[in-house]
């Protein structure tokens, strides 16, 4: 949680806020099928619904009031993964900084699966 003191009091931003912003921003990028989560019981990777996108996001807080974001995603078959990942990093960093004022130290994109087209 990030806490900022002002002359009128304190502002705290919970990790769920960062997770929601990052998950939604990543989900809206071209080539991203959705956020991914690995089941702890069977080890399988599941595609998360848009309203659960924050479950594929982990946020780490640093002492210098910056954050690191880890995103677990599924991509569409045939996309250029480095280009999609770069787009995600730019989009998530922009949206998190714009919405919260917090500096993003790093964004790590983990491509957990590729969704094949159904025929």
Protein language model regions, located:
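Contiguous, often N-terminal, cationic amphipathic patches that form binding interfaces
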Residues: 1-77, 86, 102-119
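Short, non-transmembrane amphipathic alpha-helical segments
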Residues: 81-100, 104
